[in-house]
Amino acid sequence: MWGRSLARATEMAETFGGRAYEDVDDMFADVDAVAFAVPPDVQAELAVRAAAHGCHLLMDKPVAFTTEAADRVAAAVDQAGVRSLVFFTSRYCAGQAQWLAEVQQRADWNSGYVRKYASILEPGSPYADSPWRRERGALWDIGPHALSMLVPALGPVTHVIAERGLGDTVTVVLHHESGAVSTMSLSLTAPPGSRGDTWLLFGQDDHTSMPDANTTSVEAMTACISALLTEQPGRWHHPCDVHFGRDVVKILQAADEFLQRPPERRAQPVR
């Protein structure tokens, strides 16, 4: 194990078994695969170094904060010929993954809607002291989860429109290559009465909603690790590899850049 705090890495190693490293490159040289639990900008830098050592990568979402950084990770993975996976939780929950596989069999979905309202920054939350989540907000923290299902269901995203609400709430309209339009509404600061998730796809004659997770996050992570370890003939590939992770970052960055525009360039006043 390695961490920016050697003391905390040592504590974890003593608790779970293993060795704490002071130098991260020494650890990369000794292991076959690496799982990351660091801020996205730190992850992107370390992932490039790990790939250069020949380590397979299990990354958290988002892969990075910029498309350029995500591109560097993808290039490093390709050059080294290592495997890569990004942990989009729902993609490794059996029931939700099965739902996605079923909706992908149809091409008549014309719209989608995801609402993810949480409050993970309150005292007592394991994420309350996460600086990057406080700074970047719901778009970058839970936006990847929404995109991990909307993009494979409705197709690549060509352009976005976004607007801020109360707190860190943000709503993003996604225009897909297929012609479908989807919306994701996200918050990490939702009041108790509005917390929860909604996942919907609408077709010509019906609609469908994603079922609740039937596995725990630990079981989902176990499935992710198993996928990373699965041998494949020829070039190794997975729908949640670093290249998909990079595509998610591109969408998030586009939405973030849209939100940086002055208000008069984001909306048409109603007169």
Give residue spans per PLM region.
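NAD(P)-binding Rossmann-fold cofactor-contacting core
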Residues: M1-A13
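Beta-loop-alpha module in the N-terminal Rossmann-like domain of NAD(P)-dependent dehydrogenases
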Residues: S5, F16-A74
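C-terminal helix-rich "cap/oligomerization" subdomain common to oxidoreductases
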Residues: A13, D26, A33-F36, E177, ...
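A short helix->loop->beta-strand "cap" motif at the edges of active sites that frequently abuts
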Residues: G18, H53-C55, A80-R83, G179-A180
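Rossmann-fold dehydrogenase core element
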Residues: D71-S90, A107-G112
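Predominantly a Rossmann-like dinucleotide-binding segment in NAD(P)-dependent oxidoreductases
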Residues: S90-V160, P262
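A short glycine-threonine-serine/GTX helix/turn-capping micro-motif
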Residues: R134-D141, P211-T215, E219, P239
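Contiguous beta-strand/loop segments that form the cofactor/metal-binding neighborhood of enzyme cores
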Residues: P144-D212, I225-Q232, A255, V270-R271
